[in-house]
């Protein structure tokens, strides 16, 4: 049975919700799935004052955890068109895994959130995907089999590079059912690919 890790950073809960949807899709495909988050770098008093969602159920991952999975799906909100520093800091510590080829051939994918439709979704996905390719991973996006990413009747995230959600400038918009369905679809596709490659 393929093992899938959904690894995320979520300051306000939007990416946490997307991570849960990715995991649902991967489980539907028959994979064993774990959801973990990366450590918070913001001091606790600052995070509380900024209304960060600190009560997240997922355990904090370690770098060595990454080697134990057949697929790793990474999600983080955008920070100025690229991944959040918390995720970047975590992945920067994976040099030892890279050096010994521990992630070569694993399946990878990315998902993100932005405040606006044009707030850097694709560049943020690419900032994650670049890491996955350097690690030697096989990248799986959100293919157009998920046709709802082309909807024009509502504000909706989604790109062929990965599932996305739009939060609104004040963060009040939660992932829509269409966006969650995209995350589930991508999670399922990644798990199916991992099962094909790794059994």
UniProtKB/Swiss-Prot annotation:
NAD(+) binds at residue 12. The keyword Protein transport does not apply. Substrate binds at residue 98. Pfam families: FMN_red. It catalyses: a quinone + NADH + H(+) = a quinol + NAD(+); a quinone + NADPH + H(+) = a quinol + NADP(+). FMN binds at residues 10-15, 78-80, 113-119, 134. One of its GO terms (cellular component) is membrane. It is an enzyme of class 1 (oxidoreductase). Its EC number is 1.6.5.2. Residues 4-190 form the Flavodoxin-like domain. Its cofactor is FMN. InterPro entries: Flavodoxin/NO_synth, Flavoprotein-like_sf, Flavoprotein_WrbA-like, FMN_Rdtase-like_dom, NQO. GO terms for molecular function: flavin adenine dinucleotide binding; FMN binding; NAD binding; NADH:ubiquinone reductase (non-electrogenic) activity; NADP binding; NADPH dehydrogenase (quinone) activity. Keywords: Flavoprotein, FMN, NAD, NADP, Nucleotide-binding, Oxidoreductase. Binds 1 FMN per monomer. The keyword Nucleotide-binding applies. Belongs to the WrbA family. This is NAD(P)H dehydrogenase (quinone). It comes from Rhodopseudomonas palustris (strain TIE-1).
């Amino acid at each position: 049975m393929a093992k899938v890790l959904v690894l995320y950073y979520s300051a306000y809960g939007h990416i946490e919700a997307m991570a849960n949807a990715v995991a649902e899709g991967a489980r539907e495909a028959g994979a064993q799935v774990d959801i973990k988050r990366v450590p918070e770098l913001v001091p606790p008093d600052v995070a509380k004052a900024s209304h960060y969602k600190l009560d997240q159920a997922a355990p904090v991952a370690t770098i060595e955890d990454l080697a134990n999975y057949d697929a790793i799906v990474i999600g983080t909100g955008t920070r100025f068109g690229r991944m959040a520093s918390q995720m970047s800091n975590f992945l920067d510590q994976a040099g030892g895994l890279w050096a010994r080829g521990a992630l070569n051939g694993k399946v990878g994918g990315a998902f993100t959130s932005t405040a606006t439709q044009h707030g850097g979704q694709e560049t943020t996905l690419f900032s994650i995907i670049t890491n996955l390719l350097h690690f030697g991973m096989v990248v799986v996006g959100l293919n157009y089999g998920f046709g709802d990413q082309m909807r024009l009747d509502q504000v909706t995230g989604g790109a062929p590079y990965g599932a996305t959600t739009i939060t609104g400038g004040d963060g009040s918009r939660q992932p829509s059912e269409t966006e969650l369905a995209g995350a589930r679809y991508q999670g399922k596709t990644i798990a199916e690919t991992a099962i094909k490659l790794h059994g």
